Amino acid sequence: IVGAGDKALSFDGQRGFCLYRTIGPYLVVFSDPVVRSLAERSAFLDALFAFAGQLDRRPAVYQMSLDWIPVLHDRGYDFFKLGEEAHVKLANVTLEGHAGKMYRQILRRAERDGLRFRILPPNDVADQLPQLREISADWLQAKELAERQFSIGYFDDDYMRRYPCAVVESTSAPCRVMGFANLLEGPDRQEL
């Protein structure tokens, strides 16, 4: 996420750092700040809020975990839900039985339609960038959207080259990528 280049870093000595971006009158912190210990959260926020004041910005937070809510609430923050996040244990996902019926149907249809799924290693992504860029632009145009950047990301060749990319592609000649998702692995390869 740091490598996307659309966020700045704020450091507070040895205490920690956070990703942020100034948007209008706000200094918006993205995700949890990284601190040496939970005991240092309050002091880190004090320094961060002072930094926001130096920039004549009001601090705001986006996508922080529940661990930070009590500390922020003590500073007068109110919260509202914005978006969804899911964690799925892949070991529990099955194509068997009633629970997997919908997924089996999707896979059979994809096979009938001549589609396959694969994950491109970072070294192979560069060759597909023109197709991926075109798919991204077409999707944005169809949805009448602009690149989201800060929270959802944006298409960037250099960023795409660094990570694996999941693709759905046609199996008929000429093979063409139909859709994609860049993959960012979490700690110990336990999250994507």
Protein language model regions, located:
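Conserved short hydrophobic interaction patches
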Residues: 51-55
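Conserved catalytic-core motifs of GNAT/GCN5-like acyltransferases
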Residues: 80-86
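A conserved beta-strand-loop-helix scaffold within acyl/acetyltransferase catalytic domains
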Residues: 1-32, 57, 62-79, 91-105, ...
